[in-house]
């Protein structure tokens, strides 16, 4: 896959078009990436020992790898 964890990418298609961020994770089987600060989704969580109140938590959702363009490679990925 052309995108690796740590790369700086720009979203080129979809509702988040134009946003930039760092790749947090890559799912090679599904060809999807999670970009920091892009495609934020809200999840309802129940109260638990680690989260006493529960409530709504915002996390990054995955987007298809074809919708991103690499702007800068991560230092560890430069070949």
UniProtKB/Swiss-Prot annotation:
PANTHER family: MITOCHONDRIAL RIBOSOMAL PROTEIN L24
Keyword rRNA-binding: yes
Full protein name: Large ribosomal subunit protein uL24
Signal sequence region: none
InterPro entries cross-referenced by the UniProt entry: KOW (IPR005824), Rib_uL2_dom2 (IPR014722), Ribosomal_uL24 (IPR003256), Ribosomal_uL24_CS (IPR005825), Ribosomal_uL24_KOW (IPR041988), Translation_prot_SH3-like_sf (IPR008991)
Quaternary context: Part of the 50S ribosomal subunit.
Organism: Lactobacillus delbrueckii subsp. bulgaricus (strain ATCC BAA-365 / Lb-18)
Keyword rRNA-binding: yes
Family assignment from sequence similarity: Belongs to the universal ribosomal protein uL24 family.
Gene Ontology molecular functions: rRNA binding; structural constituent of ribosome
Role according to the record: One of two assembly initiator proteins, it binds directly to the 5'-end of the 23S rRNA, where it nucleates assembly of the 50S subunit.
Keywords per UniProt: Ribonucleoprotein, Ribosomal protein, RNA-binding, rRNA-binding
One GO biological process term: translation
Pfam families membership: KOW, ribosomal_L24
Gene label: rplX
GO cellular component terms attached to this protein's record: ribonucleoprotein complex; ribosome
């Amino acid at each position: 896959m052309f995108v690796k964890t740590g790369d700086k990418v720009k979203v080129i298609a979809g509702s988040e078009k134009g946003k930039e961020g760092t790749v947090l994770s890559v799912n090679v089987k599904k060809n999807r990436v999670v970009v920091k600060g892009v495609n934020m989704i809200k999840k309802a969580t129940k109260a638990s020992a680690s989260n006493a109140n529960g409530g709504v938590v915002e996390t990054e959702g995955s987007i298809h790898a074809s919708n991103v363009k690499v702007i800068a490679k991560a230092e560890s990925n430069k070949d």
